[in-house]
Amino acid sequence: VEIDLASGKIVRTVNVLREPRSAVFSKDGKYLFVTNFLPAQRADLDYVAACVSVIDVNTFEKVKDIQLANGSNALRGLCITPDGKYVYVSHNLGRFTVPTSQLQQGWMNTSAFSIIDVENLSYAGVVIVDEPDRGAAGIWSIACDEKQIYITHSGTHEVSVIDHEAMCEKFEAYPDKSRLDYDLTFLYGLRTRIPLQGNGPRCMVTNENKVFIPTYFADVLNVLDKESLDLTSVPLNPDRTETVEQKGERYFNDAAHCFQNWQSCNGCHPGDGRT
C-alpha cells in the first residue's frame, strides 16, 4: 500500500503473495523488495518455499517473485547492503522431505539468511547460521553495515555478529552454491554469538555505533557496541508480572528447552502457532 502522508489516503495498492512482513527499497529507489511470510503453494510438492516479491516503484506493479531455497519459510527480516548489491532475508529453513525422527545437525529445522542479487533480481544462495552441534533457532531480524551483519535469534536469546566482508568473499568464491543449503560450517571463524539479557529478542534498531535489541518476553533493552561488542542491558519494566498465557507463549517460542537449541514449537508452527 502506498499512502500519501499529507492526506493520509491510500494512493496505490499492489498484491503480493502471502502475509507480507518486511520491505526494503533498492538503493536507486527503483524496486521495493517484500517478504512473503509463508509459501503460497501446495505443501505436498517436492519443492516448497516462500518468495520475495519485487515491486516496480514507478508503476507500482509486481514484476517478479523470487523463490528461495527449498524449505524456506517464516521470512521475517530484510536488509540491503550499503553498496546496494545484495538483499539479505532472514528465515527458517525446514527439512520437510525427511521423517521427523531426530534433531541433530538441523535434521528438521535450520536458521538461515538468503542472498538476493539486486542487479539480476535473482536468488543467489543461502547461508546457514547454525553450527554443527548447536542450533541458532528463532532467527528474526537482520541488519548490516559495511563491516558487520547483525542477526537476532529469538529462540536462543542472542545476537550474531558476522564479518560482512569476509562472508561476502567466501560466499562469492563458494564453488557450488546449491550445497550451501546444508553447510553448517560456512560461518566458522566469521561469526560471534553474543548472549543477551532477557528472553525473545526479535526486532532491532541500529545507528552508527550501537545496536538496540529489546526482548519480547522480558521487557529488557540490550545495547550492543558495534566496535567492542560490549553489551549493556536496561530493564524497562522491572516489576513486570507474567501471566499464565504469556508464560505459555514464551515456552512455545523458547528453543532453550530443545536438544542443542535446534528449534522451538515456533519452528514448525510459525506466526500465530498455526498447525
Predicted regions and their residues:
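Short loop/turn segments that connect beta-strands within beta-propeller blades
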Residues: 4-8, 56-60, 118-121, 164-167, ...
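A short beta-strand motif characteristic of beta-propeller blades
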Residues: 9-14, 61-67, 124-132, 189-195, ...
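The canonical Cys-X-X-Cys-His
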Residues: 258-272
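Residue-level detector of Asp-centered blade-edge/turn motifs that repeat once per structural unit
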Residues: 27-28, 82-84, 144-146, 206-209
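Conserved loop/turn at the beginning of each blade in beta-propeller domains
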Residues: 16, 71, 135, 186-187, ...
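Short, conserved, GDST-rich strand-edge loop motifs in beta-rich repeat architectures
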Residues: 35-49, 89-110, 165-174
